[in-house]
């Protein structure tokens, strides 16, 4: 939706063809960590991640201004606990206060070494709802309830897309189908679903947690309304979005191990989403094999984070400009 918004602002007529209800797949399921400094971020992705994080305050401001809706963007930062699989990185600041990590978050049971990252977090559901309002304000059309199944091509040039309900004609098509991008006929991209189960707890008190807390096996993302989002699994389960009660219980217990007061916290909701993975865990951003066809998919864990910069560089590419960030590592032809 960020790309649709950007293209419309640059004068294009935009139609979003959505397989289901807009914004109800990976974006709806995401935790909303804007983890540009995560030590697990591939180095090839770092320039995009850092650039997108810098764009976020203005991006959210524009969406709020266009929609009249509030988006919960928090800048309290992330407490990163040590992870044996990844060094903290140059952007991490060791927490050296005499009281350690509990100086920042007294509710944490953890007392060892930790690092503070200057990251933000956003409520993805509030963001998507506001973007849909902004899209309506910008007169972006949305055709929902029927997936694009085929790229229509004539003489090596895009003519539009076909769904079970209708054909939509357009000189430019962008495959933004996430985990379903590979199902887009001959114009598919090698994405696959990576299942993640999560839950939301009601904090026993509003000030229980201010920072995002990221540990090797669990993360906690506080919302301004008192919810705490707990995640997440990473499962190769195809397109299965069923929630397993035992898995949710394990996540809840891991959260309580970090913040004991969460042990008795009420569960508001549990859900599963499908991250759009790729073979090298990097997004696919670039031109397709025929004129007028582009791909912006496979953002894996970073779809919410990368929304602003994806809109910028793909708009530049579609308009025939040189993208401000080199996209060679993300091309469709690398597979």
Show where each model-derived region lies:
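Active-site substrate-recognition segment that forms the wall
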Residues: 2-10, 32-34, 38, 69-74, ...
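Short loop/edge segments at beta-strand edges and connector loops
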Residues: 18, 97, 144-146, 269-271
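A short, glycine/Asx- and small/polar-enriched loop/turn
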Residues: 104-111, 152-159, 276-281, 288-291
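Helical element adjacent to the flavin cofactor pocket in flavoenzyme catalytic cores
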Residues: 114-172, 176
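C-terminal catalytic lobe of FAD-dependent flavoproteins
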Residues: 124, 259-335
């Amino acid at each position: 939706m960020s790309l649709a918004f950007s293209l419309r602002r640059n004068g294009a007529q935009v139609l979003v063809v959505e397989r289901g209800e807009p914004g109800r797949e990976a974006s709806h399921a995401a935790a909303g960590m804007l983890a540009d400094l995560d030590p697990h971020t591939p180095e090839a992705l770092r320039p995009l991640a850092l650039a997108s994080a810098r764009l976020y305050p203005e991006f959210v401001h524009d969406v709020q201004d266009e929609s009249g809706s509030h988006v919960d963007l928090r800048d309290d930062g992330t407490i990163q606990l040590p992870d044996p699989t990844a060094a903290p990185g140059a952007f991490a600041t060791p927490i050296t206060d005499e009281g350690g990590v509990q100086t920042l978050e007294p509710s944490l049971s953890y007392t060892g070494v930790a690092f503070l990252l200057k990251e933000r977090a956003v409520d993805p559901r509030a963001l998507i709802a506001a973007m849909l309002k902004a899209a309506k304000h910008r007169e972006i059309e949305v055709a929902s309830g029927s997936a694009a199944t085929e790229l229509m091509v004539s003489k090596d040039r895009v003519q539009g897309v076909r769904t079970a309900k209708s054909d939509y004609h357009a000189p430019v098509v962008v495959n933004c189908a996430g985990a379903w991008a590979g199902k887009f006929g001959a114009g598919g991209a090698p994405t696959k679903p990576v299942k993640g189960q999560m839950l939301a707890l009601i904090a026993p008190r509003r000030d229980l947690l201010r920072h995002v807390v990221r540990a090797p096996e669990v993360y906690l993302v506080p919302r301004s309304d008192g919810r705490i989002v707990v995640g997440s699994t990473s499962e190769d389960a195809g397109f299965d979005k069923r929630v397993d009660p035992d898995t949710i219980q394990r996540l809840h217990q891991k959260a309580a191990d970090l913040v004991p007061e969460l042990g008795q916290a009420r569960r508001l909701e549990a859900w599963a989403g499908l991250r759009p993975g790729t073979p090298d865990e990097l997004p696919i951003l670039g031109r397709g094999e025929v004129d007028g066809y582009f791909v912006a998919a496979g953002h894996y864990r970073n779809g919410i984070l990368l929304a602003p910069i994806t809109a910028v560089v793909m708009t530049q590419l579609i308009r025939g400009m040189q993208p401000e960030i080199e996209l060679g590592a993300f091309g469709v032809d690398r597979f």
